[in-house]
Amino acid sequence: MKTHAIIPIFIPHEGCQNDCVFCNQKKISAKAEAMPPCEIKNTIETYLSTIDRNITKTVELAFFGGSFTGLPIETQNAYLSEALKFKRNGKIDKIHMSTRPDYINREILENLKKFEVSVIELGVQSFDRDVLIASKRGHSVEDIYNACNLIKEYGFTLGIQLMIGLPCDTKEKCIQSARKAALIKPELARLYPTVVLDDTELLKMYQNGTYTPLSESEAVDITKEMYKILAAADIKIMRVGLKSTDLICQDNAIGSYHPAFRQLVEGEIAKEALEKQLLLKLSDSSFNKFHFESNSFSFSNMIGNCGVNKAYFKDKYPDISIRFSLNNALADYVYNVVEYKDI
């Protein structure tokens, strides 16, 4: 049952003065009109008419499309004024936005506080200096820490976005970024494998051979390790992988894009957990029949995307009987291996 609803407001990326190698938002913005602040009211009301507040505990208004705090302050305030009306009358619960680390300072946060903004996500992308430079991020590692500390000091919910497979990136650098993010203790995180988009410098780098995108299996392997680090730190992982849009689809994506990328990652984590338990059982007993268990929420991860985990265990352990079973006494993302005997 869905208890959290998001009302998206798309704000084109006109506020950002930077040109990251992977970003084509300026091209997108040239083709897309920003929603005028006066139209937000109608959009919010349209979404609210589809939401059952008897079921939905939290309604969040989220400004998508780039660095919100890079917009002129008058524009920010015009959008936020409309959002605040709905928050104060109890129709929405949270106001959510994303921005860059170098677009955060005390003056900006004081203003956001005035409009009762709840959540600020930072497009951190990497904690590695060389990766930031090669990606032309235009900010430093110090800027990241300063922004995170200020956001937490002012009492906002902090989200951190990390990318995997940027120029000059390595598996170890990605894992270190996840570890450093976990030490900051944000409440939220997103993990995005790099996809080469049209009209970007990264596409030119790919075409001239100076950038090689990760394969799908490489991206899954790295993201899996980052996911485990963040999850172990009790950080809510809001998204893993890019959403499909008109600009990103399997036909035109270069790099590690998959519409079910999160399930690929979570399926690998489930497979690891199951195999670890299975090997312990096999080393301890003569049983060759087992139930692999999860609750209904995690069952698709247990069997893997398109049944890949079922096939893996069948091929690797042909002499063992394995049944994939539901056990709704288990928590989400918990997997169990139990022995069974035929009666």
Report each predicted region and the residues it spans.
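Canonical Radical SAM [4Fe-4S] cluster-binding loop centered on the CxxxCxxC motif
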Residues: 2-39
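Auxiliary Fe-S-binding modules of radical SAM enzymes
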Residues: 2-5, 209-343
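A short, N-terminal amphipathic alpha-helix
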Residues: 42-52, 224, 228
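Short helix-terminating capping/connector loops at secondary-structure junctions
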Residues: 53-58, 89-92, 283-287
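Short acidic/polar active-site loop segments enriched in Thr and Asp
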Residues: 59, 93, 118, 187, ...
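Short glycine-enriched loops at secondary-structure junctions
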Residues: 11-15, 192-197, 243
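Short acidic/His/Gly/Ser-rich catalytic and metal-binding motifs that mark active-site loops
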Residues: 16-20, 197-204, 248-250
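Conserved non-cysteine loop/helix-boundary elements of the Radical SAM core domain that shape
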Residues: 28-42, 50, 65-187, 191-194, ...
